[in-house]
Amino acid sequence: MYPTLLEPPRFQALRFFRDNFPGYQNAQPLSNVTLPSFTAMVVREIATAKAIPFDLALLGFLPSIAAADCGHSRVVLSDGSTNSLSLFIAVGADSGIGKSRALEDSLKIFSDWEHSAHEVITTENQNRNFANSLIDERIKVLGKKYAKTGEQTVLEEIYRLKNQKVAEHSIPHLLLSDATEAALSQHLIDHGIAIRLESDGVLLPKKAMRLMTKSWSGERISRHRMTAPSGVIEDPFVVDLVMTQPEFFRDFINTPDFLESGLMARTLPYYYQDMLCPREHPRPMDENTLGKLREKLLSLLNASNFCKQNPSGHRTIPVSKDAEELLRANCQNWTAQAKSASPLYRVREFVARMPQHALRLAGCLYLAEYPVNYEYPIPAPLMQTALHMTEVFLSHVLRWTIKDYGDVHVECCRAIMQFILEKNFSDVSETVLKQALRHRFKAADVSIAIYYLVSQNYLYEGLPEFTGTGKRGRPAGRTLFNPYYDQTGCSF
């Protein structure tokens, strides 16, 4: 990017309308958050080795920790209320910024663990099948004998042998790539968990949103289908991290279904905008740090109930008194702002869930920092970090979520100016703008936005274009002149 003093007016204007246009809250970066030691060490090494932004490395690390826990841990407050570590994170970032590299080491560790578990369970299933086949042969012999003699003792022996048969272990599938409602519900019924870690994935479809909101809250879910086996999910656990292109990210978090389903309040959105990505070439991670990351994820996986035939109860993570007081004070502050005329009123549904988000983030940091058998409560500094992270996500909710007509107006103004500046039009007709933005905004919204932009001298208005008396076709309307037109530039 050019230094500000040498930057052409067109690019200055484009940066202004992308980042600083009046009416938007400033979205804060996660790189400003002070992280605890182990998390900071691993995330910094991932960012450096993979030549990706620190923010994306952190956004890949935290869901990986939650995924490795597989729903085994619960954060418990002094009043007895519990919170699982289910996480929904939606990330928008431009192509080439390094989204796939943020997850590749964690995915490799999960894949290796799953492959090893497959081998162990496959061998065990072969032994079970052989034992069952021997029982079947014995039952066949006894069945012939019973048919001849009718002895009750033979029949009892047949029943006893049938009860000795053992079922096969289910083959574990930790990660899920299909985002359809049918795939998610079936995976939850089969395994009790559904985990997606997608570096360039598909955001949730409408039919899956209700299922995911209930899973995030840990509610009991029953499925009754004529075309598939029925099932009940008693204690669902879901981790859904999707990194995608900015256009898909913005469209998704502003769809009415996303807002009305309650998924918005349960999702942590993050849009990475800084185009100054690291210039270094990617390199392998430091073996010592990678070994510690692998040890951490594998210890969590092995301690979880996933793949266990006799699962234990949930691991409880208590919260220290100081940390709970810190959470309560922040919660009261957020609630007071949401009830007033502050910007938090616009996203009060998300504000109501912020204490839960903070507890889940604190739980993930706790699992990362301490051994799996650690029994001490979450300390206040760790809770402070989680609260800071929650407020960063809040800033992205405020920045990118369209909730009322004021948001529509601001977004429409930005869309008009970005379209004109990116195409580098010297002049453009009102009709062309309405056609270009017809899938996002009503024609009346575009007209109002143009009126505002002209009144603020962001655009200059020319005389209406006339097509001539008797000539067919829609009038072209006003001609708008771009004061930032770059004669030596090109469109992009």
Predicted regions and their residues:
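Phosphate-handling catalytic cores of nucleic-acid transaction enzymes
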Residues: 1-492
